[in-house]
């Protein structure tokens, strides 16, 4: 297992973080750290989540996050980012 860092841009709406954390809970993915804040565009928030897993876990997390309505962009942050 390795450390995976996922960065996303989401709608600046109530309950977006709740839906994201609920997806992690339903899939039994454990969030190690989470940070959220307003992006340059005030209608968008930036959320960064770290977790531990393999490539399959990473792929599943990204696919599930991309299905959420208020999630605009999802990507893995690599060490060189």
Language-model features, listed with the residues they occupy:
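A conserved regulatory-domain signal marking ACT and ACT-like small-molecule sensing domains
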Residues: 1-81
